[in-house]
């Protein structure tokens, strides 16, 4: 191997808070060569992201500490001992990073154009028409439709997948030598995953760019990475050429990862269950206002005349690419967005109800959002976060009774009840998502809207979460609206499926029939991309 671009030697990271010391990373050593892709894989909490953040010295120092033996060399320059000025020149220029949760990484007060142009100005001095042209070029490269129209958009006006594409465009703006990608395709639908991975490979070939890929998706690792390093409990337990590690894993933990995948069949009933939620001709249109007087000149038809039926104790899967209207449909059905069309829940019309009349029903209809870090208050412990709903709905007469309910909810999603007093920033992305699910489950709802609930979870925890959701459904007759781009998880959970594109349903029906014999070309393209990701030279997806 030639001289490495990045050399990590004896990297150790410890966090010291409230008199406690937590060793997150223990004596990790890695090399990445120019143009190489190294995948760092492991379950949530294994230390993957902490390792990546250490490279650019983005940890919360001095709460985080390295040992004196730690060395991180980028082209011979020691980043651990670099000055702030040296680090500023490297960050976003020679080394760029794509973070796991785009909503917390993008500035909510700045437009798309301003945020991407900022890095061009800082590192290349580019401004004005040249910067705008480069921003548009980058947006097109990452597959954002109608790039020119997105320049003035704010992060909250974009879907989760679109926000992640903005992050990737920002990272690629200065053609870095090393791109650190922390779950870069987690929020993306399967077809865009293939295009983004193809884009990253093309950029590597053009610029000799190296890629440190942090992911829990072993399908992506197998198809993209040159080498792989497997991490658990802060230590690397196996490294090697990807094909060899997948063919003959040596460590028991590696074998455990490779055997983990969502399995099983959705809950099925001998008799057709009663309808719990139904909507007819359901619409969510967003007005387009232009001019000084902000007159409405048109509408974005995010959801356009959809019929939805959810039965008691069953799962309705809603699938489609980012921007198809999946999340908007879920928020609209919950009366969190202005909508048109009748919504009937348990025989009651919801659409005419005001805020006060809806409140008692909020306990029965809960939601788990896509981005857990945005939906969890950083100022509250996870115990307080889960307790909020109990207080609002007056469940549990005493703090002791509420604490018992909270601990049961945390245990049910695979979290140690002893972590009840810790804060969201002390958890990994996957662990935060489990907190969000516990917050919803503690109220024992009848209907749960799950918006990409497993997208931030590693494969083995995905499988555990699917088993958990299926078990809860069987025991409590829970109904789910399961919104996801991960068709493997939908297949394991959903009894019925809606396939959405551009705000309308292109195919719907029994999930087994749709997965085995998809009728619509769009559905067939989604299936092909989900179960075997390959990208043509044009960026189109094929099997």
Predicted features along the sequence, with ranges:
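Conserved ABC transporter NBD signature motif
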Residues: 66-78, 341-350
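Conserved ABC ATPase "signature" region
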Residues: 77-78, 130-149, 349, 400-418, ...
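ABC ATPase "signature
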Residues: 236-240, 248, 505-509, 517
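A short, proline-enriched helix->beta-strand linker immediately N-terminal to the Walker B motif
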Residues: 173-177, 442-446
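A short, surface-exposed alpha-helical micro-motif characterized by mixed small hydrophobic
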Residues: 221-223, 490-492
């Amino acid at each position: 191997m030639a001289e490495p671009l990045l050399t990590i030697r004896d990297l150790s990271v410890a966090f010291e808070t409230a008199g406690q010391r937590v060793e997150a990373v223990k004596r990790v050593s890695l090399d990445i060569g120019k143009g190489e892709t190294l995948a760092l894989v492991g379950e949530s909490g294994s230390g993957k992201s902490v390792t990546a953040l250490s490279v650019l010295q983005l940890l919360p120092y001095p709460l985080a500490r390295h040992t004196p033996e730690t060395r991180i060399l980028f082209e011979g320059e020691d980043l651990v001992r670099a000055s702030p000025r040296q680090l500023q020149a490297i960050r976003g220029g020679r080394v760029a990073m794509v973070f796991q949760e785009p909503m917390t990484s993008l500035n909510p007060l700045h437009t798309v154009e301003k945020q991407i142009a900022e890095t061009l100005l800082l590192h290349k001095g580019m401004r004005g028409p040249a910067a705008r042209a480069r921003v548009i070029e980058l947006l097109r490269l990452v597959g954002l439709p109608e790039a020119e129209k997105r320049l003035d958009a704010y992060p909250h006006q974009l879907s989760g997948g679109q926000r992640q594409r903005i992050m990737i465009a920002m990272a690629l703006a200065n053609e870095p030598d090393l791109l650190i990608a922390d779950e870069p395709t987690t929020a993306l639908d399967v077809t865009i995953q293939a295009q983004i991975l193809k884009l990253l490979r093309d950029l590597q070939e053009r610029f000799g760019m190296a890629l440190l890929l942090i992911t829990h998706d072993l399908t992506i690792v197998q198809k993209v990475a040159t080498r792989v390093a497997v991490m658990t409990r802060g230590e690397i337990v196996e490294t090697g050429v990807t094909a060899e590690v997948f063919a003959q894993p040596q460590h028991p933990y590696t074998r455990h990862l490779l055997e983990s995948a969502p399995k099983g069949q959705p809950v099925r009933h001998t008799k057709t269950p009663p309808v719990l939620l139904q909507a007819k001709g359901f619409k969510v249109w967003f007005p387009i206002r232009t001019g000084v007087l902000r007159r409405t000149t048109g509408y974005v038809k995010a959801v356009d005349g959809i019929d939805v039926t959810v039965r008691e104790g069953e799962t309705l899967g809603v699938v489609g690419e980012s921007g198809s209207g999946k999340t908007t449909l879920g928020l609209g059905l919950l009366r969190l967005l202005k909508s048109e069309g009748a919504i009937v829940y348990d025989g009651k019309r919801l659409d005419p109800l005001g805020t006060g009349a809806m409140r008692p029903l909020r306990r029965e209809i809960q939601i788990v959002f896509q981005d857990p870090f945005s939906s969890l208050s950083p100022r509250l412990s996870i115990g307080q976060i889960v307790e909020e709903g109990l207080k609002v709905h007056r469940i549990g007469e005493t703090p002791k009774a509420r604490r018992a309910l909270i601990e049961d909810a945390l245990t049910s999603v695979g979290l140690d009840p002893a972590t009840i007093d810790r804060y969201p920033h002390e958890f990994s992305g996957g662990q935060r998502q489990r907190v969000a699910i516990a917050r919803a489950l503690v109220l024992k709802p009848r209907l749960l809207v799950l918006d990409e609930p497993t997208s931030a979870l590693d494969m083995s925890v995905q499988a555990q979460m699917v088993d958990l959701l299926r078990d809860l459904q069987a025991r409590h007759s829970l109904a789910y609206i399961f919104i996801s781009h991960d068709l493997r998880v939908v297949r394991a959970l959903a009894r019925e499926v809606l396939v959405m594109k551009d705000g309308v349903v292109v195919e719907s029906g029994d999930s087994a029939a749709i997965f085995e014999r998809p009728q619509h070309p769009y559905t067939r393209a989604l299936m092909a991309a989900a179960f075997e990701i390959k990208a043509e030279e044009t960026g189109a997806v094929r099997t």
